Amino acid sequence: MSEPRFSYSLAQLQEMSADVLRRAKDAGATAAEAEISLGFGQNVSVRMGETETIEYNRDKGVSVTVYFGQQKGHASTSDLSPQAIQDTASAACNIARYTAKDEFCGLADADLMAKDIPDLDLYHPWALSVDEAIALAKECERSAREVDARISNSEGASVSTYEGMFAYANSHGFNGGYATSRQGISCSVIAEEADSMQRDYWYTTARSAKDLDSAAAVGRLAGERTVRRLGSKRIKTARVPVLFEASLASGLISHLVSAISGGNLYRKSTFLLDSLGKQVMSSHITIEEQPHLLKGLASSPFDNE
């Protein structure tokens, strides 16, 4: 794992987070939490063999949440200067003073704070030049278009890199953070046959570029998936078993996750309201939460509570 390439070190972000908490406490807050994040990356796209876009992004932000008993206030800024942080903490406190009390407001209990923060191997920067990214994107698109003569057009291929750093602290004494990366290659093409036109895509994404599928493999699969759609037709309405491919099956699970999320339950905006203890999915389905998978795209050593 390479050293992070950020404007601030993780230790500096953690000190800034602690400073936010001190400012909130001085303003009268009984509890507070702060998040500070940095991120930068690039995205290159090509279409029909020509470079279409070269984009760079760099962002940063501070988010402050304060509690005056059971009154809550929140404010954020993209300016990391000491004065901006002071103003943001003050704004959050001013908001909290005028909000209604909510019996469920507050930090998670202190004994629920993470004690050990494991290294999940989430940071693998990809020192990819723009020219190298363009070459990979062109290779990906070319591979897709060579799959079949019926592939007549392209929506493009892209190569992206991203690095981020995050720190979180709260008034229970917790202060932690980590760096992450995410790399990706994608392609989408269009195929025609008679009066039928179909499009499909494929992509690969990973924490480390070494774990990505090759650009040629991504393009080839995008082309094969597109051609496979040609000749498709409606079927009659029927009650039959349905087999979903992996990329669609995960979407079905996301509906369940959304339905049982705390926010939706609190707002009573879920179809699973009052379903605690009830069977809501097929008995052969088991869902496990594994937040500590090494290099996992959704892995995290701790959450924001």
Over which residues does each language-model region extend?
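Active-site bordering "gate/hinge" segments
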Residues: 1-304
